[in-house]
Swiss-Prot record:
Keywords: Acetylation, ATP synthesis, CF(0), Hydrogen ion transport, Ion transport, Membrane, Mitochondrion, Transmembrane, Transmembrane helix, Transport. It holds the Pfam family ATP-synt_8. It is a single-pass membrane protein. It is found in: Mitochondrion membrane. F-type ATPases have 2 components, CF(1) - the catalytic core - and CF(0) - the membrane proton channel. Component of an ATP synthase complex composed of ATP5PB, ATP5MC1, ATP5F1E, ATP5PD, ATP5ME, ATP5PF, ATP5MF, MT-ATP6, MT-ATP8, ATP5F1A, ATP5F1B, ATP5F1D, ATP5F1C, ATP5PO, ATP5MG, ATP5MK and ATP5MJ. Interacts with PRICKLE3. This is ATP synthase protein 8.
């Protein structure tokens, strides 16, 4: 049964881990240097709601006597 040749594993795994470490560090550094801009508050016009424009009758359940 042939043996698995692992001599090149160290030369592959080490640069890969180094690259992943550098990428994560750059991402963290970039997020701390440039915080997200705060949202700009604009004045909004209040919208007319349909239930505020017209009067609606409120019905009571049939089991209750009418309330005047």
């Amino acid at each position: 049964m042939p043996q698995l040749n692992t001599t090149t594993w160290l030369t592959i795994i080490t640069p890969t881990l180094l690259a992943l470490f550098l990428i994560t560090q750059l991402k963290l550094l970039n997020s701390h240097l440039h915080p997200p801009t705060p949202p700009k508050f604009t004045k909004t016009k209040p919208h007319a709601k349909p239930w505020e424009l017209k009067w609606t009758k409120i019905y009571s359940p049939h089991s209750l006597p009418p309330q005047y």
